[in-house]
Amino acid sequence: MPTTFKEIPRERPVTPLLDQADTPHGLRRLGEAELETLADELRLELLYSVGQTGGHFGAGLGVIELTIALHYVFDTPDDRLVWDVGHQAYPHKILTGRRARMSTLRQKDGVAAFPRRSESEYDTFGVGHSSTSISAALGMAIASRLQGSERKSIAVIGDGALTAGMAFEALNHAPEVAANMLVILNDNDMSISRNVGGLSNYLAKILSSRTYTSMREGSKKVLSRLPGAWEIARRTEEYAKGMLVPGTLFEELGWNYIGPIDGHDLPTLIATLRNMRDLKGPQFLHVVTKKGKGFAPAEVDPIGYHAITKLEPLNAPVSVQKKVSSPKYSGVFGQWICDMAEADSRLVGITPAMKEGSDLVDFSERFPERYFDVAIAEQHAVTLAAGMACEGSKPVVAIYSTFLQRGYDQLVHDVAVQNLDVLFAIDRAGLVGEDGPTHAGSFDLSYLRCIPGIVVMTPSDENELRKLLSTGYLHTGPAAVRYPRGTGPNAVIEANLDPVEIGKGVVRRQGQGVAILVFGVQLAEALVVAEKLDATVIDMRFVKPLDEALVRETAASHELLVTLEENAVMGGAGAAVSEFLARANILKSVLHLGLPDVYVEHAKPAQMLAECGLDAEGIEAAINERLALIG
């Protein structure tokens, strides 16, 4: 069984077997008897590596043995291995030639946080969002068959990701085309937060049967032995009355279901995978793992150790005076929703499996009957809110910008067309840093402002966030407030829940010649630049409805209008300004500053903003360049 470590090593560990096995070809030269020692070395290397850089942590620890077994049994990269989401892919990266570069993990020009096709031939499909792996592996399996290839396609998906409808769409389709593929359910009872819903309960009931394997003839040919009784007992729920054969759900869909087996038992994993490798058609293997396995603190607190920051040096200087920390924007939202829930009993909070990330823990504890975690099901979350709004509730959907993309049709068809009172609290808007382009909130202003009837707001600091959340909540019809990851400028936050006038911006600095129209948290940078250029700075607040009167007035009194946003320039807030000027037949020089028409690669947020010219230096340079052109 795996060794359990109690501390993250600060010095690179001695790993003689891993030194020989940093590619799958090297791994396959090892004897099976050496693999359990290799697993301990790989786990220790992962602890050391992530301790140096920070990053996703618990999920990778839980799939050490599975990762070794997959690369040992299958002919990767010819056999296609697809990791769902990618939080668990660090051991895979270490074993596929990237060990020496793991010190650059999540850093500018370094190893990406998630599998990337451009990074390695072993990363057969780029991921980051949940529940895509089965569809991707199915597509690969079909294409391979059309090309006359016998290669295997393998999807590794967690029980959390299996709560999303897309996964079941693929599970339903694969048997129809008799796809030669394997789906591995990594069942650790976790996604990021604990799983919820009927499917999670169903999987737990599967674990409650200790004798099911002997009841299935097919399993006898595949499983070398059952997992330890103590492991099953630990995960047991009361046996579901009348459930004779676990896995019925998957078998009824047309899959050959095997399991569950112990995902930390390497001999069993290898023997089972070898047998399943030669089976034709859609195969489904259910493995039971523990998130954070092998690191004692993570086993106790898998949510807290989902990801970690890098270790501070032992000799780092200790500041005598504590720095006053600004509140996180998500924290401001978390306080606001509790305050508004106290004031209005109609408020309900909805999140797709991001209770901790969206800062809804306090709300869920204080108002449990009004809190709804729908699991990884963004489409359902939006339409659930629509249904609640139809009956007089006031739903607040707390969701990351990048994940709202997955519920866009529901936002349009089910909420906006019916003009329902739903507030979208859109977290992680703009560039998010080390997680890279799959998690950036680059497009929400563009895809929201084209929807008729919606109010779209961009707060510039913590106090503005609270005000605009109240404004959106009290508005009749759909509304959206987008705010970034991290902390604000430590603005004084007013305790009231008063709204502001919809569609009205605020002049924050009066200057001349140049006017900077700010949509969001770049207000601080704009004010720095304005002091140098004696420019006017306007906090626009609203992308939709746009303060057209203020834009018209400003255009008449300034030589150059500059729009500033942390959103794609194409179709964003700046485009809204230019569209208005065109409709009003106002000829004016306009400079749009925002995210360029590329995917901005992972780095620290400040580095990403500088790369896009959205720091104070870049903003000033762009304005001076335009002023030079217009004379």
UniProtKB/Swiss-Prot annotation:
It comes from the Bacteria. SUPFAM superfamilies: Thiamin diphosphate-binding fold (THDP-binding), TK C-terminal domain-like. This is 1-deoxy-D-xylulose-5-phosphate synthase. PANTHER family: 1-D-DEOXYXYLULOSE 5-PHOSPHATE SYNTHASE-RELATED, 1-DEOXY-D-XYLULOSE-5-PHOSPHATE SYNTHASE, CHLOROPLASTIC. It comes from Pseudomonas syringae pv. tomato (strain ATCC BAA-871 / DC3000). Pathway: Metabolic intermediate biosynthesis; 1-deoxy-D-xylulose 5-phosphate biosynthesis; 1-deoxy-D-xylulose 5-phosphate from D-glyceraldehyde 3-phosphate and pyruvate: step 1/1. The lineage of its organism: Bacteria, Pseudomonadati, Pseudomonadota, Gammaproteobacteria, Pseudomonadales. Keywords: Isoprene biosynthesis, Magnesium, Metal-binding, Thiamine biosynthesis, Thiamine pyrophosphate, Transferase. Catalyzes the acyloin condensation reaction between C atoms 2 and 3 of pyruvate and glyceraldehyde 3-phosphate to yield 1-deoxy-D-xylulose-5-phosphate (DXP). One of its GO terms (cellular component) is cytosol. One of its GO terms (molecular function) is thiamine pyrophosphate binding. The keyword rRNA-binding does not apply. Mg(2+) binds at residues 159, 188. Homodimer. Its EC number is 2.2.1.7. Thiamine diphosphate binds at residues 87, 128-130, 160-161, 188, 295, 378.
